[in-house]
Amino acid sequence: MAFPQTRPRRLRATHALRGLVRETHLSPSDFVYPMFVAHGVDCRKPIAEMPGVDHLSIAHAVEEAGEAAALGIPAVLLFGLPATKDEEGSGAWDEEGIVQLASRAIKDAHPDLLVITDLCLCEYTSHGHCGVVTPEGVVDNDATLELLARTAVSQAHGGADIIAPSDMMDGRVGAIRAALDEEGLAGTPIMSYSAKFASAFYGPFRVAADSAPAFGDRRAYQMDPANGNEAVRECKLDIDEGADIVMVKPALAYLDLIRRIKDETEVPLAAYNVSGEYSMVKVAAAAGYIDERAVVLETLTGIRRAGADIVITYHAKDAATWLQ
């Protein structure tokens, strides 16, 4: 039937009707809240490039994690800022490293909150690349796998509930899965940054995490933003290697791929609403150009509607508050 028998506006007439037929629902339980943890005592340092986001000492990270949990957010994602860096990135697998210490403290204080640890070497290497760099300036994929596996085991022993490798080395999921299993950590899930693009939207994060490469860029290992079939292939390869959850990063410029990957795979799918996406909203809202609450909730709903089961977002606490 067509108009006038069919009138879609009938089901839009009231708030109750719109809620009754709503196809996509947004809940705090969908969110993961990223946090930047740093050494220091009673340190809470605002990140200018990411309004509303701070570098947190461990005590403040525990407090922030508790606030997230109280809002119904089930998980936090930890990024560490080490006190020192070296060529290998050895601070990543230090048993007393910043992520390991923060994980233990958060789990001790909030045992029901899931702690996800980002696994990459870029925050720990003096050159800012995500792996071992050869004398020719190339990231050595296979040499890096051993260090990633070592870091994964250290993070899991440190209290991480889920390991999230973001380095984009070939074979990293299989290497990490094997290392965890050998250490008696077969129950530790892997959430892989499977389709991680070489994106311009990471700018604020690289300042926040002090992880910009000292030379070159990451296009030789992160994905070309023009490629969709490759993103699906990367996810399927990671699943074959043992990934329990796959991820698309960034989210907003890649909603088509969130949908494709959701349709073509059978594991939970995460999407990362990244720093550049976040900061654009915060700056525009501060200037009075947009309604922050409305735009954030519309954005997160769009990511969920595209097919994401899990949304990693710096807006998590605000969005959870608005959804109460």
Please give the residue ranges for each predicted region.
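N-terminal amphipathic/basic leader segments beginning at the initiator methionine
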Residues: 1-22
